[in-house]
């Protein structure tokens, strides 16, 4: 096989560098997924079950990107055409999945308030020890009261709705919903950022694979 030219060595270096970036992004995704998982679990099993799939999916995607990025690094270092094309194929599949997930996350954020409202209204209508602890934690953490306001308690406002004898006036649906939306947007932005680097990696990996194949036939 002939020696790769300067341009192809640059492509090889680009593939390697982009994969290192994707690898770091995958670690960020795994960390973000773990953080969201822990955060959601702090607010009780009722909330955790509703959004449990989201952080787990983020962690799984992060692990897959980690493995695929490693494959890309090996393909670039070894100048292996088969590994580079496999790497590009897996990246295309991941790219489509991530774009779909990011779009769904952005669209889904408009439904958060209605789902939180249904969850909290149902919790206040049929209070149990677990649900009461869940509401108390939300109220004390986010300085809110009830689903839509302190009137939800019909005059029997719990201590978690107060601070120095002042009752929180905002409902938890709007306050907690805004918290979830912010985190959802952050996750979507990270996903779009990862997709950008993956798209570059796909193009450069295919170019490198084609050029290596041409050099092998010289």
Curated annotation (Swiss-Prot):
The alphabetical list of record keywords is: Glycoprotein, Membrane, Transmembrane, Transmembrane helix
What protein family is recorded?
A: Belongs to the tetraspanin (TM4SF) family.
Q: What is the lineage of its organism?
A: Eukaryota, Metazoa, Spiralia, Lophotrochozoa, Platyhelminthes
Residues of this chain annotated as glycosylated in UniProt: 165
User: Which residue stretches are annotated as topological domain Cytoplasmic?
Assistant: 1-12, 72-82, 206-218
- Pfam families for this protein: Tetraspanin
Membrane topology according to the record: Multi-pass membrane protein
Q: Where in the cell is it found?
A: Membrane
Q: What name has this protein been given in UniProt?
A: 23 kDa integral membrane protein
User: InterPro entries per the record?
Assistant: Tetraspanin/Peripherin (IPR018499), Tetraspanin_animals (IPR000301), Tetraspanin_CS (IPR018503), Tetraspanin_EC2_sf (IPR008952)
Q: Does the keyword Protease apply?
A: no
Any one cellular-component term (Gene Ontology) = plasma membrane
Q: What is its main location?
A: membrane
Residues in the Extracellular compartment per record: 37-55, 109-183
Tell me which domain of life the UniProt entry assigns to the organism this sequence originates from.
Eukaryota
Q: Which residues cross the membrane?
A: 13-36, 56-71, 83-108, 184-205
